[in-house]
Curated annotation (Swiss-Prot):
Name of the protein in its database record: Serine/threonine-protein phosphatase PP2A catalytic subunit 1
Enzyme class: hydrolase
Protein origin, superkingdom: Eukaryota
PANTHER family registered for this protein in UniProt: SERINE/THREONINE-PROTEIN PHOSPHATASE PP2A-RELATED
Chain segments carrying region Disordered: 294-315
The protein's required cofactors: Mn(2+)
Modification after translation (UniProt): Reversibly methyl esterified on Leu-315 by leucine carboxyl methyltransferase 1 (PPM1) and protein phosphatase methylesterase 1 (PPE1). Carboxyl methylation influences the affinity of the catalytic subunit for the different regulatory subunits, thereby modulating the PP2A holoenzyme's substrate specificity, enzyme activity and cellular localization.
Active site: H123 (proton donor)
Gene Ontology molecular function: metal ion binding; protein serine/threonine phosphatase activity
Residues that hold Mn(2+) 1 according to the record: D62, H64, D90
GO cellular component annotations of the record: cytosol; nucleus
GO biological process, one term: mitotic cell cycle
Length: 315
């Protein structure tokens, strides 16, 4: 992950001020967003489609614009650069502060590029986030679509997957019938909108199936479902031990299936401010032992009490 894109002392001061500004609940100016996106693309374009990551680190799932809960996550998991982070995508949409959320994520990436990995989720795509809230939020907060276009350009540079210590395969969604070897991911051109089918699509859209083996048609309309037998074959063929992914709301914030070899991590508590779920982050130590930490939503004024319920199917 080493890069020649080192920050000057002046740039460090500027980005630190931006991080402080965001944590105080203020949005960046259009010019600040433009400069941030340019610098972020310079850093991200040096990263391969598969990031090789060292432990210890903390793995986090979907955030979905829940900015206050992201701040809570860092309070619980530790601030950068003291803690290394791997985020599995879906930073925007659904929540009301996707602008602040992705601005902070990019600012942290620029400031501590070797301490945080940002993978792409299925919502880091124009076709999706123009429908599910990010576009409208950008327009509402800036009065035009310029900032949205700048952010969506960055989405194309986000890596597609990571492997922790050559043993834990990480992607937003999961596996693909088009992938026998993880090396196939290296050949993809990721700087594009997410295709409607194929390996790149499946990495960001697929879901594990608990009760059936083999491949199945996904109810999402993109990606596939895959069974325990597929997980076992994939891990054996690629000399891996586990799969860590996000993409699905799970009420406890974490779910382990396929003989605990496929782990779903979801890091947006009380998803959409109404689902009543817990969130979770997973710390992985040098011996690859996993320690999960579940947490509730950050306190908010005037927020109604929410009962725990499984919602209608979400993209």
């Amino acid at each position: 992950m080493a890069s020649l894109n080192k920050l000057s002392s002046n740039e460090i001061g500027n980005i630190d001020r931006q991080i402080a500004k965001l944590k105080q609940g203020q949005i960046l100016s259009e010019q600040e967003v433009k400069s941030l996106c340019i610098k972020a693309k310079e850093i991200l374009q040096d990263e391969p489609n598969i990031i090789q990551v060292r432990a210890p680190l903390t793995i986090c799932g979907d955030i979905h614009g829940q900015f206050h809960d992201l701040i809570e996550l860092f309070q619980i998991g530790g601030n950068l650069p003291d803690t290394n982070y791997l985020f599995l995508g879906d930073y925007v949409d659904r929540g009301s502060q996707s602008v602040e959320t992705f601005s902070l994520m990019l600012s942290l990436k620029v400031r501590y590029k070797d301490r945080i990995v940002l993978l792409r989720g299925n919502h880091e795509n124009r076709e999706i986030n123009k429908i599910y809230g990010f576009y409208d939020e950008c327009f509402r907060k800036y009065g035009n679509e310029i900032v949205w276009k700048q952010f969506t350009e960055v989405f194309g540079y986000l890596p597609l997957s990571a492997i922790v210590e050559q043993q834990i395969f990480c992607a937003h969604g999961g596996l693909s019938p088009a992938m026998e070897s993880v090396d196939q991911i290296k050949q993809l051109n990721r700087v594009q909108d997410i295709p409607h089918e194929g390996l790149m699509c499946d990495l960001l859209w697929s879901d594990p199936e608990e009760t059936k083996n083999g491949w199945g048609i996904s109810p999402r309309g993109a990606g596939w479902t895959w069974g325990c037998d597929i997980t076992e074959k994939f891990l054996h063929s690629n000399k891996l031990k586990q799969i860590a992914r996000a993409h699905q709301l799970v009420m406890e914030g974490i779910q382990k299936v396929h003989n605990q070899k496929t782990i779903t991590i979801f890091s947006a508590p009380n998803y959409c401010y109404r689902c009543g779920n817990q969130a979770c982050i997973v710390e992985v130590d040098e011996q690859l032992k996993m320690n999960q930490t579940q947490f509730e939503p950050a306190p908010r004024e005037n927020e109604p009490h929410t009962t725990r319920r499984v919602p209608d199917y979400f993209l």
